[in-house]
Regions:
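Conserved GNAT acetyl-CoA-binding A-motif
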Residues: 111-123
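A short beta-loop-alpha structural element at the N-terminal edge
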Residues: 6-21
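Conserved acetyl-CoA-binding loop-helix of GNAT-fold acetyltransferases
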Residues: 90, 96-109, 132, 136
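Conserved beta-strand-loop-alpha-helix junction that forms the acyl-donor binding cleft
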Residues: 95, 121-130, 147-150
């Protein structure tokens, strides 16, 4: 991995359009996985509401760029001492090049700076790319919720 290939920065309101485009790509990609509608209900898209998200004291959004082009983002919500990555998405062309790892490292740094002691993350069942990203960052699954209609 070339550590200088990508840079991470705090999201700004001017990033709303880029976030919305990446979110659409994430939703399209996620349609193949179980639970996508539930996760969208629990972790709604943020692009259209970015100003409120950024002004909230318990959330932050980081952007990963390559040559000033947005390649991905992470949306994190803080509850007490726990930072939860509600959504992380890396554009297809930036995958397996270190963008996700660099973004997660920055998420950890920011979460620690904000007083968090633990980091959690959400991934859909079958989403091996996201699961593998988390595992490479030494984040292991600790809970699996199974369900059935009655």
């Amino acid at each position: 991995m070339n550590d200088e290939l990508f840079s991470v920065r705090a999201c700004e309101i001017e990033d709303a359009q880029s976030i919305e485009l990446l979110e659409r790509e994430a939703v399209d990609e996620g349609q193949q996985y179980r639970g996508v509608q539930q996760i969208l209900g629990e972790a709604p898209l943020i692009g259209a509401d970015l100003s409120n998200v950024l002004s909230s004291g318990n959330q932050f959004v980081l952007i990963v760029d390559h040559q000033s082009q947005t390649q991905g983002f992470a949306h994190v919500v803080i509850d007490g001492e726990v930072a939860t990555v509600r959504r992380i998405f890396i554009a297809t062309q930036a995958r397996n090049l270190g963008a996700g790892a660099k973004l997660l490292t920055a998420v950890r740094t920011e979460a620690k700076r904000r007083g968090c002691k633990q980091i959690d993350a959400i991934a859909l069942p079958g989403d091996r790319l996201t699961k593998n990203l988390f595992e490479r960052a030494n984040m292991k699954a600790r809970l699996l919720v199974a369900s059935s209609d009655l």
